[in-house]
Structure formats: structure tokens, C-alpha cells
Amino acid sequence: MKKPCLATALGLVFACQNLSPAAEVPNAIIAPHAKDLVVLQGEKLVPFESAQFLKAPYTIIYFGAGWCPDCRRFSPALVQAYNQQPNGADRFEVLFFSMDKSAEGMLKFIKSEKMLWPALAFDKLPTAEELKKYYSGHGIPCLSVIDPKGKLLLQSKSDQDAQEVLNALQDQARKPEIK
């Protein structure tokens, strides 16, 4: 008997989700860290503020690092998928959780990959150990897809799995809303 592939599992997860066009409440897991988010602006990281970010129906927590060859190979696909999403309520959001060894390494990686989404500030990573503990998987790159309540829907195990997670999210975003 064949094992079900990740794409099939993803389809089932998304089919079983009861999601409104936009979540009614901010993401329960990320909201406590909202004040610690930064985003690339020009050549530096600046504080990030967006209530809409916290209301996405899906949030991908992306664990990665610039020193990781698999992360550098995978990141362009995530950037492309993120940038090609249609505007609207079904957008997924991404939160970068750096596994780099320094703030400079994190900034260099974000700049080189042109990541437009927020990241947890490097000096605040120790205050977010629960995110790392519950969502980081067993290696990087790791994509953990969570719903607004913080329920882990999917988690990649490798850069190949990460690509399948991305493909499923893009397919979900393209589906017309059923009312």
C-alpha cells in the first residue's frame, strides 16, 4: 500500500479547515511577539507594524539561516510564492525565525533573499523560545504552517517537503471562496 503523499495530506488539512476570508482575531501565537517584529527597509531592519499580518488565515513560520545551503536554495521559491499571491483575505503570511549566529548574519540573509515579510528581531529570539520549541521541527529549512489559533497544520521535514507545503498553500489561495 502506498503512503499518501504530502500534497494529499495538505489537501485534506485545508479541506477540513473552517476558515473565514480573514481571521476574526489576531494570531494567538504571534500576537504576543508583534512588538518584536522587524522588516527590511532599505539597508536595515526597522520595526514592523501591521494588524492585517496578524489576521492571516495561515501563517508560515520559516526557520532558516544564511549559513544553511538548503535554506539559500529554498528561500527564492518562498519569496516568489509570497510575492505572487493575489491580494485579499486568503493570503498566507510568513514570519522569519532566524537560526543565524548573529544579527549581521540574519540581516545579510534577509537582504540577499529579498524577504519582504517580517522577522523576529535577532535580540528578541530568546524571548520566543516557545515558538522554536513547538514549531521548529528537526532541521532547517523548516516551514510550519499554523492557523490563527496557533494550531500546527503542517510542517516540512526537508527543503523538498517545504516546496510541497508552498505548492499546497498556493493552490489553496487560488481556489474561489465558497459561500
Q: Which sequence ranges carry the predicted segments?
A:
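Bacterial N-terminal signal peptides that target proteins for export
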Residues: M1-T8
